[in-house]
Amino acid sequence: MKKLLIKLVAVVIIIFSFTGCYALSKKYSYKVNPSDNSSNFSKYMGIYGALTDSYDKDSPIESVSIYPINFSNKKTSEKVELLSNKIKVVYKGKEYYLKTAKNKRSILPYEEGIILKEGAIVYFGKVKVDDKMIIEIPPIRLKKFVHVTSYNPIADGLNIDTTKDVYEGPLDEYKGR
């Protein structure tokens, strides 16, 4: 009888640990969504800012990049390129001029010793899209975004995918814990 009770308790503990134990994972970044800006550029490219530690909300910006998205006739825009060698950034009233990376798609403020966080305004200037057109990007204020997922760490350790998206959007609109 005692062995049966121990087995029953062990089974109940295992069931609760697989079904009831969830952890939240939060990943932070900076983005510009098409709805954030009324300009024409958002049809052709997106802008993304990576942090030095994407799991730390107060981490500085490591890089700001442009990337191609849907082209006007539903083809993927394959190439975007910054035309300026230096990009102007204004943060806390100071102006910085950052070199364009070798890929001609990003700037690396942290690598150049400049700490940027939310509130930085980036002046990209002109961008070439697919060697066909040149678009002027207006000044961009990057907005901090968060991607929250929940997962079961015990099941995850056993290669059982329990990951669920909880929220993805602007940090200031996130109402979770």
Describe every region a protein language model picked out.
Residues S17-S38:
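Bacterial Sec signal peptide processing site at the extreme N-terminus
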Residues M1-L24:
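Sec-dependent bacterial lipoprotein signal peptides
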Residues I47-I87:
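Short, surface-exposed binding/anchoring microloops in extracellular/periplasmic proteins
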Residues K132-R177:
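Short beta-strand elements
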Residues V89-Y91:
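Intrinsically disordered, low-complexity segments enriched in glycine and mixed charged residues
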Residues G93-T149:
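Short, solvent-exposed, Trp/other aromatic-anchored flexible loops in extracytoplasmic proteins
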Residues D36-G46:
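N-terminal topogenic membrane-targeting module
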Residues S39, G49-T52, Y96, I134:
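Short, isolated positions in well-ordered beta-strands
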